[in-house]
């Protein structure tokens, strides 16, 4: 089956495969998932994630309001608020927002998401949306189990990985891919979306690289 007949979802998977593999197997994430780090490092990851999810969801709000990809940009996927509740738990209720310092990679990531928001760039937003949320619906479930197994993280601090508004994850993911395939895009928009998705994985890899510095 060629990408031309397979649809955008398959094109995205194929065109981002190398960047996805690199991000997924970063040293930081490998160490975290294999039990070589600790709750402190997991907390740092989630704090940085809160910064870029906040920016991502503000961009999604702007694009959704424009009428582009409304059904795809489902607010049930939003993670920033539940992530904040997790961080309250991980920080034992102490104030954490004011002490977070965005890493250089997160600054770059957030700047790009804010640019997408300001330009109401629907295809670019969909690329970042796909990379983050489809990953959360898939590999995120593994991360939650590993955080409990290796570090004893309280399940109440892992709400980020549980999508309360989504009953069946596989069905939802299949529907998400079908919505991707049904997007009306020009050839230029499609090409830009595919490139942006690879860029999104690169941003994520750089975030993990920054987190791994000094360990």
Swiss-Prot record:
Belongs to the heme oxygenase family. This is Heme oxygenase. It is an enzyme of class 1 (oxidoreductase). Its EC number is 1.14.14.18. It catalyses: heme b + 3 reduced [NADPH--hemoprotein reductase] + 3 O2 = biliverdin IXalpha + CO + Fe(2+) + 3 oxidized [NADPH--hemoprotein reductase] + 3 H2O + H(+). CDD domains: HemeO. The lineage of its organism: Bacteria, Bacillati, Actinomycetota, Actinomycetes, Mycobacteriales. One of its GO terms (molecular function) is metal ion binding. It comes from Corynebacterium diphtheriae (strain ATCC 700971 / NCTC 13129 / Biotype gravis). Keywords: Heme, Iron, Metal-binding, Oxidoreductase. One of its GO terms (biological process) is response to oxidative stress. The keyword Transferase does not apply. The keyword Metal-binding applies. Gene3D superfamilies: Heme oxygenase-like (1.20.910.10). InterPro entries: Haem_Oase, Haem_Oase-like, Haem_Oase-like_multi-hlx, Haem_oxygenase_CS. Allows the bacteria to use the host heme as an iron source. Involved in the oxidation of heme and subsequent release of iron from the heme moiety. Heme b binds at residue 20. It comes from the Bacteria.
């Amino acid at each position: 089956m060629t990408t031309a007949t397979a649809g955008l979802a398959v094109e995205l998977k194929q065109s981002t495969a190398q960047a996805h593999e690199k991000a997924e197997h970063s040293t930081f994430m490998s160490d975290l998932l294999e039990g070589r780090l600790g709750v402190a490092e997991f907390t740092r990851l989630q704090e940085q994630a809160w910064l870029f999810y906040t920016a991502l969801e503000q961009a999604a709000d702007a694009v959704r309001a424009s009428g582009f990809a409304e059904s795809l940009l489902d607010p049930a996927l939003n993670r920033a608020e539940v992530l904040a509740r997790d961080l309250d738990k991980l920080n034992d209720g102490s104030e954490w927002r004011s002490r977070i310092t965005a890493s250089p990679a997160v600054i770059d990531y957030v700047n790009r998401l804010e640019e997408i928001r300001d330009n109401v760039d629907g295809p670019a937003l969909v690329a970042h949306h796909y990379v983050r949320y489809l990953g959360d619906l898939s590999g995120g479930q593994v991360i939650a189990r590993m955080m409990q197994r290796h570090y004893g993280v309280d399940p109440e601090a892992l709400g980020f990985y549980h999508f309360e508004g989504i009953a069946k994850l596989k069905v939802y993911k299949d529907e998400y891919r079908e919505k991707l395939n049904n997007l009306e895009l020009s050839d230029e928009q499609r090409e830009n979306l595919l490139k942006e998705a690879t860029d999104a994985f690169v941003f994520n890899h750089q975030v993990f690289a920054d987190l791994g510095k000094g360990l």
